[in-house]
C-alpha cells in the first residue's frame, strides 16, 4: 500500500484526495501518475523524518518522471534531505541539477547560498579569511538570484546583504 494511503493527519489526507481528483481530471499517462505517487510518498516520508524511505521514493519518481520541471522539484527535495543529513556537497549537486531544469526555483538558490554562507563561517573558524570571503561572495550571488525571483522572501538574506555591503 502506498504511503499516501496510510496518512493519518487531516492535511495529508486532504492533499491526497485533491491530488487523486486532479490525476483523474487532468489527462496523464500511467507513468506520470506512478511518478507522482512516488513523489507524494517521498514528501510524506520526508515530512516524517524517514529520509531513507523518502530517497527511495524520490529515486523511483526520478526513474519515471520525464518532465524537467517536475524533475526539478524531485531533485530539490533530494537536496533537502542531503542538507538535513549534513551532506552539503551532495546537496549542492542536487540543487544545481534542479536549477538546470528549473532556473526559477528561488528556494534552491537560497539553499545553495545558505550552504555557501555556512562554509564561509567554517573558513572563519579555521582562520582562512580569503576562503571565507570567497564563500560569502558566492552566498551573496545566490541570495541575489533568490531575491530577484522572490522579492518578498529571504528578508534575513536581504539584511545580511545590506549589512555586509553586498547589495
Swiss-Prot record:
Task: Please give the GO cellular component terms listed in this UniProt entry.
Answer: chloroplast thylakoid membrane
Residues in the signal sequence: none
Localization in the cell? Plastid, Chloroplast thylakoid membrane
UniProt xrefs under PROSITE patterns: TPR, TPR_REGION
> What InterPro entries does this protein's entry cite?
PSI_Ycf3_assembly, TPR-like_helical_dom_sf, TPR_rpt, Ycf3/AcsC/BcsC/TPR_MFPF
| GO-annotated biological processes | photosynthesis
For whether the record's keyword set contains Transferase, the answer is no
SMART domains per the record? Answer: TPR
Biological role stated in the UniProt entry: Essential for the assembly of the photosystem I (PSI) complex. May act as a chaperone-like factor to guide the assembly of the PSI subunits.
| Name of this chain's protein | Photosystem I assembly protein Ycf3
Q: What species does this protein belong to?
A: Chara vulgaris
